[in-house]
A protein has these predicted regions:
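Short, charged/polar micro-motifs that form catalytic or ligand-binding hotspots
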Residues: 5-9, 62, 86, 93
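Stable alpha-helical elements in mature extracytoplasmic
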Residues: 11-18, 68, 72, 92, ...
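Long, well-ordered core segments of solenoidal/helical folds
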Residues: 20-33, 95-110
Length: 144
């Protein structure tokens, strides 16, 4: 997981394979966003692989987490911040915009607060209890 520090320690070439994987996940992620959520943009769930798997995995608690594309786009933007390469930013802007469009389409108004929250949402680490005391993995507006 050297990509966490790659830019910071002056090894951007170690970050590039991860950045390229992110760009390669856009097309399969668009299909997943449309098929599972009827949303624009693209999504990647908790796990992927070199073959472009972007769909939810078998466990709702961790397999339904939709935040991976946003996290990956943070890396794209971090690379830009270290390089200030405008041509690079122009190339990755559609990737970042696509992830943002997905999240915009996932917003719903939470009944209790009126806040806009993502739904469905989950935490890969934690379950919660519903009103009847049952363990649940999906809800509206889950914070990580």
């Amino acid at each position: 997981q050297l990509y966490w520090l790659a830019e910071r320690i002056g090894l951007p070439e170690n970050h590039e394979p991860f950045l390229e994987l992110t760009r390669q996940l856009v097309e399969p992620g668009k299909k997943t966003a449309q098929a599972y959520y009827r949303a624009r943009g693209w999504v990647v769930h908790t796990m992927t692989n070199p073959w472009g798997v972007t769909s939810p995995m078998e466990n709702a608690a961790w397999g339904s987490t939709v935040g991976s594309a946003a996290w990956q786009c943070h890396h794209l933007f971090e690379h830009y911040l270290y390089t200030l390469d405008r041509e690079y930013l122009e190339r990755v802007w559609p990737v970042m915009k696509g992830a943002a469009c997905f999240f915009a389409d996932m917003l719903v108004e939470q009944r209790e607060t009126g806040w806009l929250v993502t739904s469905p949402s989950s935490s890969p680490e934690n379950l919660f209890l519903d009103e009847q005391g049952r363990e649940c993995a999906l809800c509206e507006g889950r914070g990580l």
